[in-house]
Design a protein with these regions (language model features):
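Intrinsically disordered, low-complexity terminal regions
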Residues: 1-326
Length: 326
């Protein structure tokens, strides 16, 4: 038994060896081109550089098997493919994320990869991976990003964004354009920028701060926080509370609802709006005077604040509603 244990231990220790593959390619292009990256596993990072006139690609892959020959065979059977067609650069790498365990928690089979691309600012990107995160920064052009196994991060993008992940959170910072983001496995965090925003998650909370433009957001798995939004707001959660700090003057309609918590709104004392606040699971209170329309009830408050204005609708089935002065 001791001999068997020792052999198993030594076998597990030998798994630590791995074979690495490094590739660097450069393609001459002009602004206004397209980048396409389709990989079976690994993270993708795209960075736009001012004044750049080429696309530079760095590839790092690491394959772990029980022996070197299997690792080298995998790399040979799954090459990285580069194609340039005019002003379009395409990178493809077949293969799937592969993890399996041996005794003592050591990796028996493992595939890792990281793809880094530097390109001109004015470039459109289409990125897809089944096994890692995607990050894009400083691009002036449309961004399409899809991953099944990691988060998404967009920074300083000037153009439309379509981002989807089944396995992580999404962060958007200082981006301007028509933004559509969706995740089944994490939260959404947006700060700065403007345009239009549509965001949905089944697995976390949503925080939107200092965005200039209309937003429509929804989550089944967390709370919602919105602060300093210049534009219409529509947000719903089935799994948490809602917190909002509203800009003054309020210039657009606001609709916030939850099935799983309270709603807490802060607004300046001189803000003018039409309030419609209703709850099935608590009370409604307001620090600001409300000229009531209809009957006064503990669970429903409807009327005008400071002579009225855009609609502020607050509805919850699972908590109280509080409107507070900033």
């Amino acid at each position: 038994m001791k001999t068997l244990f020792a052999l198993l231990f030594l076998s597990a220790c030998t798994v630590s060896a791995a074979t690495e593959d490094k590739i660097n390619k450069t393609f001459t292009v002009s602004p206004g081109g397209d980048l396409v990256v389709e990989v079976g596993f690994g993270s993708i990072e795209v960075v736009a550089d001012p004044g750049r006139s080429d696309v530079n690609v760095d590839v790092w892959r690491k394959i772990t098997r029980s022996n070197t020959s299997d690792e080298e065979a995998y790399l040979k059977e799954h090459p990285v493919e580069f194609i340039q067609d005019g002003n379009t650069v395409t990178l493809r790498a077949l293969g799937n994320t592969q993890f399996s365990w041996s005794w003592f928690g050591a990796w028996r089979n493992r595939n890792e990869a990281h793809y880094v691309v530097h390109l001109p600012e004015k470039f459109a990107t289409k990125l897809k991976t089944s096994g890692g995160q995607i990050a894009v920064s400083n691009v002036s052009g449309s961004v399409n990003a899809d991953t099944s196994g990691g988060g998404l991060r967009f920074t300083n993008i000037h153009g439309s964004i379509n981002g989807h992940t089944s396995g992580g959170g999404i962060k958007v910072a200082d981006c301007d354009g028509d933004i559509h983001i969706n995740t089944s496995g994490g939260g959404i965090d947006v700060s700065g920028g403007g345009g239009t925003l549509h965001g949905n998650t089944s697995g976390g909370g949503i925080t939107i701060k200092t965005f200039n433009g209309p937003i429509e957001i929804g989550t089944s798995g967390g709370g919602i926080t919105v602060e300093s939004i210049q534009g219409p707001i529509k947000g719903h959660t089935s799994g948490g509370s809602v917190h909002a700090i509203l800009l003054t003057p309020i210039t657009s309609d606001i609709d916030l609802s939850t099935s799983g918590g309270g709603i807490h709104v802060k607004v300046s004392a001189n803000a003018a709006f039409a309030l419609d606040a209703e709850t099935s699971g608590g009370g409604v209170s307001s620090d600001l005077p409300v000229t009531v329309q209809g009957n006064i009830g503990r669970n429903h408050l409807k009327g005008t604040v400071n002579s009225g204005g855009p609609s502020v609708r607050l509805h919850t089935s699972g908590g109280s509603i509080n409107v507070q002065k900033l």
